[in-house]
């Protein structure tokens, strides 16, 4: 049943372990506002965060904003919209001195911030204003961000490519 509810490209992009995790998260979701799962991948030196919640709750925006507020580097993201109204957002976050393998406190703090966001106790702007900004070396050439949307008649999928200078939160 789970696979029938997912988009066509789901099995091409999600591993069997991820599919099993998504099924477990959805089963435990029930009457909660969201479910957040954290896992550290030692072989790639990154953290994987998976958020499961109802569509329309601005899940991607809230998760990315919360991670950005902690000045963590997002390496990749996957978003899956189920036909039954559930969204699954997975982010790969670089392990660093701010978020090493043993530091579970930062992930508890992120979960608490998400709880406050989903319950409406705080807004994302307030969380982002509290973040520490790190000044880097000035770039010599400005780069104009571009978004390319590619949709071809023979391909049922839309490819969105973003070109921009990389920085925390991008």
Report each predicted region and the residues it spans:
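Regulatory modules associated with amino-acid/nitrogen control
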Residues: 1-170
């Amino acid at each position: 049943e789970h696979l029938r509810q997912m988009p066509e490209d789901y099995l091409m992009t999600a591993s069997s372990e991820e599919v099993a995790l998504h099924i477990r998260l959805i089963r435990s979701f029930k009457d909660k506002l969201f479910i957040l799962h954290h896992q550290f991948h030692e072989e790639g030196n990154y953290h994987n965060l998976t958020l499961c919640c109802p569509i329309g709750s601005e899940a991607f925006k809230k998760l990315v904003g919360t991670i950005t507020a902690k000045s963590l580097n997002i390496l990749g993201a996957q978003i899956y919209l189920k036909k039954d109204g559930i969204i699954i957002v997975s982010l790969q976050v670089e392990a660093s001195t701010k978020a090493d393998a043993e530091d579970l406190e930062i992930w508890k703090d992120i979960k608490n911030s998400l709880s406050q966001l989903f319950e409406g106790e705080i807004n994302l702007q307030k969380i982002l204003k509290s973040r520490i900004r790190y000044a880097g070396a000035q770039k010599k050439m400005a780069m104009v961000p571009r978004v390319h949307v590619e949709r071809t008649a023979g391909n049922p999928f839309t490819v969105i490519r973003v070109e921009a200078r990389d920085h925390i939160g991008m």
